[in-house]
Curated annotation (Swiss-Prot):
Regulation (activators, inhibitors): Inhibited by fructose 1,6-bisphosphate (FBP).
Role summary: Key enzyme in the regulation of glycerol uptake and metabolism. Catalyzes the phosphorylation of glycerol to yield sn-glycerol 3-phosphate.
Source organism: Aeromonas hydrophila subsp. hydrophila (strain ATCC 7966 / DSM 30187 / BCRC 13018 / CCUG 14551 / JCM 1027 / KCTC 2358 / NCIMB 9240 / NCTC 8049)
Residues that coordinate or bind sn-glycerol 3-phosphate: T15, R85, E86, Y137, D245
PROSITE patterns in the cross-refs: FGGY_KINASES_1 (PS00933), FGGY_KINASES_2 (PS00445)
Official protein name in the record: Glycerol kinase
Reactions performed catalytically: glycerol + ATP = sn-glycerol 3-phosphate + ADP + H(+)
A GO cellular-component term linked to this record: cytosol
Pathway where it operates: Polyol metabolism; glycerol degradation via glycerol kinase pathway; sn-glycerol 3-phosphate from glycerol: step 1/1
Gene coding for it: glpK
Chain residues that bind ADP: T15, R19, T267, G310, G411, N415
Enzyme Commission number: 2.7.1.30
């Protein structure tokens, strides 16, 4: 490693924006650049992105961040990529031109294809071999939809003229001028086309969906030099790390070992627990997915998604208008000792893990004449912690592992009240790191390890510092009483919309 290679760049391609973040040897952020892009909603429940706009924004933020920081491409040791998972691009091999917009992970248009696969008895096969539930969320049915609905697409696919990729694959293809068609196991594991036991594309799933093997990228480790780019002008920079956003955050939080877990508090909450070298099947509504071990090798994880985390606070602000700013919630919630018996179940779009109840609806229970604004705000914050406790309980049951501490990241972790209540409700210490850009950091770490910029996972552990550790303070009886009230409230919210 020559002395002037002082930085690693993480490209963080998210659902609403593309970002580039420069890290130095001490994992400090030296510069960032960000651009939003257009969300397309052609029909109710459909969500698309323009792959060329994704590429344009991602390419330009990379150039911008170098210009902003005054860095030359010669000073960049490697590029790591982290991305929104499941979002699907199909393009022509010869021209590099997408044949349709990217179908986004949130898009529900393939629900009918999923129902058809269930009717053919594939649910158990999908669960056992891909670790996933049969749902429109994942890429496989999206590829089938494009082949079925774009004129001439299936014929071109059969002739080997089309390529498929998740966003990581598309970016690497563009950055290497069409030389490299690759993905990593974390992204492959979200397609419903990848066998997480054999770590190979699953021929049966490809046959069931009518997708030719020739469309698929090569699956390579999450930390490896895949190819080079001359973007940013001048020298060839190695592209050396790839991970889906949640797995990247798990790696960025240094959850390399079995039994370590992180929770990301964003619009929703994503909790992942590293379960080591063997996949753990969930009997409690979680997904079995691929994680990354300390040397970039394949590990496994359990994953649980809560739909309404920070979005519950947005609802207080935008719809109820009882706060002006999300940051106010800490102040109001701390003005009262409890919620005065009020529970808010934010099942506005149904409930995610571990319930998976699309018919649940938002519910506020336990209201009395004395209930006021502070109680409702506190109940909204507490609902985020209760839902995360639901997921953690399922994880501990499935894995047989008692969590020693939960690492946290995402916007809502700045809320001290929420973090303390989370620790109390889980009876588990909650660790907030100094650097909360853990998703981008994970991609940077993977790339840096691949080129020797950092020598080992032990060296990375020296870069991790704790801002604050929240220790449980609530007594057992109080915790049990409050959580039992939550379970009762959840029951009231369930199956509400079924009769519609």
């Amino acid at each position: 490693m020559s002395a002037e290679k002082k930085y690693v760049v993480a490209l963080d391609q998210g659902t609403t924006s593309s970002r580039a973040i420069v890290f130095d040897q001490d994992a400090n952020i030296v510069g960032t650049s960000q651009r939003e892009f257009t969300q397309h909603y052609p029909k109710a429940g459909w969500v698309e992105h323009d792959p060329m706009e994704i590429w344009a924004t991602q390419s330009s933020v990379f150039t911008e961040v170098l210009a902003k920081t005054g860095l030359r491409s010669e000073e960049i040791a490697a590029i790591g990529i982290t991305n929104q998972r499941e979002t699907t691009v199909v393009w022509e091999k010869a021209t590099g031109k997408p044949i349709y917009n990217a179908i986004v992970w949130q898009c529900r248009r393939t629900a009918a294809i999923c129902e058809e696969l269930k009717a053919r008895g594939l649910e158990e096969y999908v669960r056992e071999n891909t670790g996933l539930v049969l749902d429109a969320y994942f890429s496989g049915t999206k590829v089938k939809w494009i082949l079925d609905n774009v004129e001439g697409a299936r014929e071109k696919a059969m002739n080997g003229e089309l390529l498929f990729g998740t966003i990581d694959t598309w970016l690497v293809w563009k950055m290497t001028n069409g030389e490299v068609h690759v993905t990593d196991p974390t992204n492959a594991s979200r397609t419903m086309l990848y066998n997480i036991r054999d770590l190979k594309w699953d021929q049966k799933m490809l046959d069931e969906l009518g997708i030719p093997m020739s469309m698929l990228p090569q699956v390579k480790p999450s930390s490896e030099v895949y190819g080079y780019t001359t973007r940013g002008g001048g020298s060839r920079i190695p592209i050396a790390g790839i991970a889906g956003d949640q797995q990247s955050a798990l790696f960025g939080q240094l959850c390399f070992e079995k039994g370590m877990a992180k929770n990301t508090y964003g619009t929703g909450c994503f909790m992942l627990m590293n379960t080591g070298t063997e996949p753990v099947r969930s009997n409690n509504g979680l997904l079995t997915t691929v994680a990354i071990g300390p040397k970039g090798e394949v590990n496994y994880a359990l994953e649980g998604a809560v739909f309404m985390g920070g979005a519950t606070i947005q609802w207080l602000r935008d719809e109820l208008k009882i706060i002006h700013d999300a940051r106010d919630t800490d102040y109001f919630a701390s003005k009262v000792g409890d919620t005065n018996g009020v529970y808010l179940v934010p099942a506005f779009v149904g409930l995610g893990a571990p319930y998976w109840d699309p018919y649940a609806r938002g519910t506020m229970v336990g209201l009395t004449r004395g209930a006021n604004r502070n109680h409702i705000i506190r109940a909204a914050l507490e609902s985020i912690a209760y839902q995360s406790r639901d997921v953690l309980d399922a994880m501990q049951q499935d894995s047989g592992i008692k969590l020693a501490a939960l690492k946290v990241d995402g916007g809502a972790v700045a809320n001290d009240f929420l973090m303390q209540f989370q620790a109390d409700m889980m009876h588990t210490p909650v660790v907030r790191p100094t650097r909360i850009e853990t998703t981008a950091m994970g991609a940077a770490f993977l790339a840096g390890l691949a080129v020797g910029f950092w020598k080992s996972s032990e060296e990375l552990e020296d870069k991790f510092s704790v801002d604050r550790e929240f220790i449980p303070q609530m007594d057992r009886d109080d915790r049990a009483k409050r959580y039992n009230g939550w379970k009762k409230a959840v029951e009231r919210s369930r199956r509400w919309a079924e009769e519609e």
